[in-house]
Amino acid sequence: MEALLEGMQRNGQGSSGFLTSCEAELQELMKQIDIMVAHKKAEWEGQTQALEACLGVREQELSSARAALEEKHKEVGKLRQQLEDMEAAKQDLVREYEQQLKKFQEELARLRRSYEKLQKKQLREAREEATKRQGDDQCEMSRLSRKLEEFRQKSLDWEKQRLLYQQQVASLEAQRKALAEQSELIQTQLASRKQILESVELASRSEIQHLTSKLERANDTICANELEVERLNMRVDDLTENNRMILEDQQRVAEELRQSKKMLEVLQDEKMELRATLQSQEDFIDSSKLHQEQLQKELARVTETLHTKEILIRALEERLQEKQLSSPGLEHILLQLDVAQEKEQHLQAEVTHLEDSLVSSNARCVQLSEELAESIKELQSMEEHRAESKVEIKKLKEQLSQAEQIHRGELEGMRKEILRLTQELHQRDITIASAGGSTSDLEQRLRMEIERAERKAVEHRMILVQLETLKLENRHLSEMLEKVELGVLEGKDATLRALSEDYVVELNKLKSENQQLKKDLSEAREKLELTTQSQPEGTAQQLQSEEPEPRDVQHRPTQESQHKQDEQTEKIHHKPDKTTQHHQRWKIQPLPAEIPVAVIPEASVLPTQTSRKSCVESPTLAAGALQGTDSLLLVLDDSKGFPDATSRQSNHEQESVPLCPLPTSSVGSVAARYLEEEELRSQHILECLDAHIEELKKESEKIVRHFGHQE
């Protein structure tokens, strides 16, 4: 027990010495904290330099994107120049066609005069031969009148089809106007979006500067917070070390308490055993006392009997002395005396034996009482030691509670600091998330613009498909007309008489159709100018509305698109040259007198109709409006001679086929390829934006994990 008390005192002295030696350790820890602060400061300076380098790289990327935009503007200027060159070439073609029309009108006037002469000659011959061929002429006239009725019926059907086609062309014109209005709206929207993007770019620059300043301030605050966190961490380490030592002392004290409890239990067991032995000894003492009392009573009784016997002996001796009895009586009395003396000796031996046993029992009782007193003293000392140990335990518990309160207070302060730091980090995350949200909004707007452009491209393709179908129908109708012309040429003599009256009307129609063709041609030219002006503006605005992307990503699609556009412009330049060469080969020759002129009106009306249809079908291409004049020239070339009609018709068809689809195929392919390239570029920009957003998310997660580990 004394060793246990000494160990507890030593533990108390060690804990007090540890508390007094904390100041030197705190000074050493402050030195280490200064070293760590300098190290962290160097790290943060390196990180700020890296961020400044990243900002420089981003500015370089912005400058490269601007350079790419300037290159695109230059390409757009080149395309505009090429379109102007094409427009000039088309105007030259129109002038040539107008000259050919003038020649054609002169030929028509000459044909009219020759037709009048031929008509007079035929009337004169008809009067001479009227008597001879009256019957044959009547049959032939009836047959030709039936054919004429059939042809008129077909012409009515063709007129109905022409009206239907005109209605379709009007609907297509309305659609084109609606598309033009939509394109104007889109251009205005693109201009407004361009302004918005410029304002957003300025705002983003100011925001970047503001964020850089915030970042610097945040870096300073983070450095200070890291210093504070390191100081708090060191303090926490000290407190945890103190707490660990206190816990070790507490465990040691608890172990000693357990050992003392075990010793107390052992002592209590010994005390119970001693109490049992004392109880047994007390019972034995009580029994010995009772036996002693009985022995004393027996001794008193024996002494009384001895005393009585002595008295009797004395009385007998006196009697003997007084009465001098006879010898037998004396012997008998002597024998009784001897027996009494033996009994007395025996009783004296028993008395001595009893006295000896009483002395031994008294000695045993004294020994047991001494042992009992010693055990009582030991129990008292153990109780005192237990009380002292309880007092020590209370003191240790109070010290532990005080240390825990101090530790809890320090932990609360650290938690408050950590909460403040986490709130600041959360605010930074919110700013980063807001920046990411603005980028996502821009990305969404860009996607919406790309979807709208795709829809416009799909509508444009549908319109092109409809135009192709209408062209196929026009070709089919032209083939039908040629077949009808061949059928009409078989009955040339009868039709000359029957259609002589309709020739003047159809010629007037032809003039009106030519005037209408000129008007349509001028309208198509104006529309083409409008579309050529709107398309480069739309492409430029679309290029300006796109996000800037890295340098190595932009050069590949721009080079490919430039190469494709160069090839397409070369094709466009080559094709008008071919068409001009092809049209220069055509020469309008005068018709011989044998050609039936009545074929021309019906053959000229329908090609002019088809020319009007083809002109309206492709409002964005001025060359499509010249198909009617080409077909008129083909009819004139076909009417040179009957033996060569089929061969010349096939040759002119082979030569005139590439003239009509030339502008639609070249410019349509250019527009389609340009739209495809713009779609690829928009997809690539979206992928780059997604990758950049993913990198920002990863960096923010790394920062959050880093500060989470520090906490």
Swiss-Prot record:
- This protein's record includes keyword Cell cycle: yes
Q: Which Pfam families match?
A: CEP63 (PF17045)
Q: Where is the composition biased (Basic residues)?
A: 572-585
Q: Which keywords does this Swiss-Prot/TrEMBL entry list?
A: Cell cycle, Cell division, Coiled coil, Cytoplasm, Cytoskeleton, DNA damage, Mitosis
- Stretches of Polar residues bias are at 530-545
Compartments annotated for it: namely: Cytoplasm, Cytoskeleton, Microtubule organizing center, Centrosome, Centriole; Cytoplasm, Cytoskeleton, Microtubule organizing center, Centrosome
Coiled-coil features, chain-numbered ranges: 23-192, 224-535
Question: Highest taxon of the source?
Answer: Eukaryota
Return the Basic and acidic residues bias intervals: 548-571
Location of the region described as Disordered in the Swiss-Prot/TrEMBL record: 529-585
Q: Does the keyword Cytoplasm apply?
A: yes
Its main subcellular localisation, reduced to a broad class, is cytoplasm
InterPro entries of this UniProt entry? Cep63/Deup1_N
Q: Which GO terms describe its biological process?
A: cell division; centriole replication; de novo centriole assembly involved in multi-ciliated epithelial cell differentiation; DNA damage checkpoint signaling; signal transduction in response to DNA damage; spindle assembly
GO cellular-component term (any): centrosome
What family does the entry list?
Belongs to the CEP63 family.
* Chain's role: Required for normal spindle assembly. Plays a key role in mother-centriole-dependent centriole duplication. Plays a role in DNA damage response. Following DNA damage, such as double-strand breaks (DSBs), is removed from centrosomes; this leads to the inactivation of spindle assembly and delay in mitotic progression.
User: What name does UniProt use for this protein?
Assistant: Centrosomal protein of 63 kDa
Q: What is the lineage of its organism?
A: Eukaryota, Metazoa, Chordata, Craniata, Vertebrata
